[in-house]
Amino acid sequence: MQFGTSPLAHMGLWVTDLAQAKRFYVDTLGFGLLRRMQGAVFIDAQGTLIALTGPAEQTDAADRFDPFRVRLDHLALAIVDAGELAGLRDQLDAAEVPNHGVEQEPGTGATYITFYDPDGIARE
């Protein structure tokens, strides 16, 4: 059965430090803060809802993202104008966010920046 889809509606992310994740998405990336609740923050990423949830009581305090486990590999967010990527790179550099600078995918010609959130998960 086929069904119609639209762009990503929302994503939920468990984070190790809710305040740090909120600063990253709101202050560093410039996304809108929609709402705060006990243990959660809701972000508007240009029309896509990002629900950030702080660590559960059962989460080991030393738990960290491991790129070699089964996991979400990365999340790619669309940008309206590829010309804005250089400004985003400068913004990430100023905030000392690890990134690979502006790159171009050899197969598709897509231009992007890979950068990492405070938990080490890749974003494009």
Regions found by a protein language model. Give the residues of each.
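Short secondary-structure boundary/capping segments
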Residues: 3, 41-42, 64-67
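Vicinal oxygen chelate
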Residues: 1-4, 89-124
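N-terminal beta-strand motif that seeds the catalytic metal site of vicinal oxygen chelate
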Residues: 1-19, 72-77
